[in-house]
Curated annotation (Swiss-Prot):
Membrane-spanning segments: 30-50, 88-108, 114-134, 184-204
Subunit structure as annotated in this protein's UniProt entry: The subunits of the cytochrome bc complex are a Rieske Fe-S protein (PetC), cytochrome b6 (PetB), subunit IV (PetD), and a diheme cytochrome c (PetX).
Name this polypeptide is given: Cytochrome b6
Role this protein plays: Component of the cytochrome bc complex which donates electrons to the photosynthetic reaction center.
Predominant localisation class: membrane
Lineage start: Bacteria, Bacillati, Bacillota, Clostridia, Eubacteriales
Length: 213
């Protein structure tokens, strides 16, 4: 720490302030840990996703084969894929439980309205990550689920038809749909989620945790 302090003056005070920041006594229960557990699942998703990206091939011809290779041939591949799969399921559940806790305790009220909005965006991003990742194995179930998702998007007023074409890569389902979902899943959506997470935690830090009901 001294070495860092010499090169970045003040970093020691920042680290000490973060480490020694008092936590209200009413937050010392599992219901106030749901947000942190959601973040933990997101970190697991990122780490296991990087490992899976080493072997995954986002083409219609090779996608399913590469997933099978990860599961059956790569050392610990089945474990890593299972961790990615189940941490996704758990993250979605925890996001909903976290938002229910925030709503029940009134933590979304003034002056924390913007943090609630950021949390709503994070919920949408979590669902979008789950949806885009579902197509990547490119099996029958995931393929038709994605087609249904595109048709559902088509029902949106004004932007629906355009959004469907953007998702599918054309009037009909094309190979570009897989590559677009892959880019969304591994690059765009995680980057946007990280931005909202940083904003979310900064607002928590500045505004503090809400008082008990």
């Amino acid at each position: 720490m001294k070495w860092l302090e010499e090169r970045f003056p003040g970093i020691g005070h920042v680290a000490k302030d973060v480490a020694d920041h008092p936590v209200p006594s009413h937050t010392l229960n599992i219901f106030f840990c749901l947000g942190g557990l959601t973040l933990l699942c997101f970190i697991v998703q990122c780490l296991t996703g990087i490992f899976l990206a080493f072997y995954y091939k986002p083409t219609p011809e090779a996608a399913f084969t590469s997933v099978q290779m990860i599961t059956n041939e790569v050392r610990f591949g089945s474990v890593i894929r299972s961790m990615h799969h189940w941490s996704c399921q758990l993250m979605i559940l925890l996001v909903f439980l976290h938002m229910l806790r925030v709503y029940y305790t009134g933590a979304f009220k003034r002056p924390r309205e913007l943090n609630w909005v950021a949390g709503c965006f994070l919920l949408v991003l979590s669902l979008a990550l789950a949806f885009t990742g579902y197509l990547l194995p490119y099996e029958q179930l995931s393929y038709w689920a994605s087609v249904i998702g595109a048709e559902t998007a088509n029902t949106l007023p004004v932007v629906g038809p355009t959004l469907k074409i953007m998702m599918q890569g054309g009037i009909k389902v094309t190979a570009e749909m897989l590559s677009r979902f892959y880019v969304l899943h591994v690059m765009i959506l995680p980057a946007v989620a990280i931005i909202f997470l940083v904003a979310h935690f900064i607002m928590i830090r500045v505004q503090g945790i809400s008082d008990p009901m």
